[in-house]
Amino acid sequence: MTRLAVLPPLAGGLMGLAAILGALLLLGLAVWAWRDRQFESTASVADAYDRWTDDQLLERLWGDHVHLGHYGSPPQSVDFRRAKVDFVHELARWSGLADLPPGSTVLDVGCGIGGSARILARDYGLQVLGISISPGQIRRARALTPADLNCRFAVMDALALDLPDASFDAVWSVEAGPHMPDKQRYADELLRVLKPGGRLAVADWNRRDPAVKPLNRLERWVMHQLLVQWAHPEFASIPGFRRNLEQSPYARTADSQPEGTPWLVDTADWSRETLPSWIDSIVEGLRRPGAVLGLGPQAVLMGLRETPTLLLMHWGFATGMMQFGVFRGRKSA
């Protein structure tokens, strides 16, 4: 058989595959446009994460870390799952949690399925309590955690923590803030349960400070999509959430600082270091097609349904409309 005889069927097969993929993408876009996940209450956040956990798609593609990766500065070519693990270690070092003595207690607010909590317990010898509003995430976190690892998990609302004041040596929270309708209350609860001298580590998706540059018409549309597609009531800016932390009544103890003395919070922008995560989140489905196809047609559709939001997130962070803020502080002793 000549090469010319082979080309037409091969070309036809590729065109057919492209047509199928195109149709699936259009179907995913239709679902994306027709049915959003607009924030209504904490129950809507819990429901969204229960569904994301129960369908297993995120875990099969991303492993046990439902957060962005850290690719170095400048960003390097790193395996997506490796970058997620590296992120935990980078934030632990930057915030000072890595310097805590073994046995120190840590609260992980918005723990997902426990990936960060297990690293903090296993690699740093810390005692970790992970909390999430999603019962599905907590069930999965418990199932993935070895019995001999010093990790516990509980269903709890981050805006009404059922925990005593000053009960943890450190508080850790990664990418939970966008789901909080009351940013000041969120900051207050993080600091309320932190012991005097305790360390705070927060990482979040933030919007550009509107006082520096308001959103233009295109950015307002993109921002609306980023809010309604993933159950976000609002994004704080980096300086805005820093003020929430510094102005909290729990930022200082009665004996440590006189009234009006600020509790200083350090911040940094890790947008560049985490930016490759958004495209990798999509490419991971191509690298591991069996992980998606093995879950059936609905998983394929749901993967396609998330693609537009991932692309908009990449655009937002690449253009500076969004920023990946990290926050650290040490509560006055």
Residue ranges of model-derived segments:
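N-terminal auxiliary segments of SAM/dcSAM-dependent transferases
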Residues: L7-E59
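Acidic carboxylate diad motif detector
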Residues: V202-D204
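Class I SAM-dependent methyltransferase SAM/SAH-binding core
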Residues: L107, I113-A160
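Substrate-binding/catalytic lobe of Class I Rossmann-like enzymes that use SAM or dcSAM, i.e.
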Residues: P214-V300, R305-M321
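A short acidic, Gly/Pro-enriched loop at the edge of an enzyme's catalytic core
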Residues: L159-A170
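A short SAM/SAH-binding and catalytic strip from SAM-dependent methyltransferases
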Residues: A170-D182
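A short glycine-rich, Lys/Arg-flanked "PGG" loop and its adjoining helix->strand segment in the class I
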Residues: Q184-R199
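Conserved alpha-helix/loop element of class I SAM-dependent methyltransferases that forms part
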Residues: R81-P102
